[in-house]
Design a protein with these regions (language model features):
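Active-site beta-loop-alpha junctions of metal-dependent nucleic acid enzymes
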Residues: 112-115, 132-155
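Two-metal-ion RNase H-like nuclease active-site motif
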Residues: 101-111
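Short, basic alpha-helical/linker "hinge" immediately adjacent to a nucleic-acid-recognition surface
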Residues: 1-23, 34
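C-terminal domain-tail junction helix/linker
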Residues: 210-260
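Short, basic interhelical loop/turn and adjoining N-cap
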Residues: 26, 35-47
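Basic, flexible linker segments flanking DNA-binding modules
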Residues: 42-96
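RNase H-like two-metal-ion nuclease catalytic core shared by retroviral integrases
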Residues: 163-165, 170-173, 185-208, 215-226
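Mobile genetic element proteins and their domesticated derivatives, centered on retroelements
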Residues: 17, 31, 48, 107, ...
Length: 260
């Protein structure tokens, strides 16, 4: 099992991160990609975000140099209501760094005013393969059932799930138990930690525009959108589609189950 990196940065390493953030306006992702070539041990961008968060908690202002400042700060202090939640800080590095298939991000695409039906969207962090389904309401029982149904038939082994702190995911322990996975929660108001699902939801909104009542979207259309996205070439995959990328990987022998 991968162990999380501890905060033992040298003074020189901290100075490098601080300078690139404040002076050069580099993102944590860019800094992490250049960290080793600058003469330091390799670190992930999530490690740098954690470093920034600890600096903020100590009264520092590094966070003000982030491009997504508004999302990072949030609107108010979060008061959690989900018991036994495991923080994304505990998620293994192999999942953070997109080194394998099976690490999933899940979310809801909701109707106006959060009323009525929603789309349960899930995406594999490495392949960008997605699974979309319709849920009649946001109760924990309904959402849990749809998440388990979709990911049980996705066509490859699921290893981890990461979501936000919405109360619709309060039944996370049941989901994790039924699927045999580890379940993690992103930090409150930290959408940057769930970049894959944020991007997927943006693509969904191109085909099902924001403001659409999901009650009026039939199941067939949702599955058509799913198929379009899974067959859409991606630059990050070397211009392969998620389906094409998965077909080239070992361990995806049940490719026939994948929705094309």
């Amino acid at each position: 099992m991968c162990r999380r990196q501890e905060f033992h940065l040298t003074i020189a390493a901290k100075d490098y991160i601080n300078d690139k953030l404040v002076s050069d306006k580099w993102s944590p992702m860019v800094i992490s990609k250049h960290f080793e070539s600058a003469g330091f041990d390799t670190i992930s961008h999530t490690y740098i975000y954690s470093y920034i968060r600890k600096d903020k908690e100590s009264g520092g202002e590094l966070y003000k140099s982030l491009a997504n400042l508004n999302k990072y700060q949030g609107k108010k202090k979060y008061k959690g209501s989900i018991s036994n939640r495991v923080s994304i800080d505990k998620r293994p590095d192999v999942a953070n760094d997109r080194k394998r298939i099976g690490d999933i991000e899940t979310d809801l695409v909701v109707s106006p005013k959060n009323q009525g039906s929603s789309i349960v969207s899930s995406v594999d962090r490495l392949s960008r393969f997605c699974c979309l389904d319709k849920v009649a309401n946001k109760t924990k029982e309904s959402v849990s059932e749809i998440v388990v149904r979709g990911l049980s038939n996705i066509g490859f082994d699921i290893l981890t799930i990461t979501t936000d702190n919405g109360t619709e995911f309060i039944d996370h322990e049941s989901i994790a138990s039924q699927l045999g996975v580890s379940y993690y929660f992103a930090d409150p108001y930290s959408s940057y930690q769930r970049g894959s699902i944020e991007q997927l939801n943006g693509l969904i909104r191109r085909l099902i525009p924001k403001g659409t009542f999901i009650d009026e979207v039939d199941y067939h259309l949702i599955k058509t959108v799913e198929s379009k996205l899974n067959n859409r070439p991606r630059k990050v995959l070397g211009w392969l589609s998620p389906i094409e990328y998965l077909m080239k990987q070992d361990g995806c022998g049940e490719i026939g189950q994948l929705r094309v």
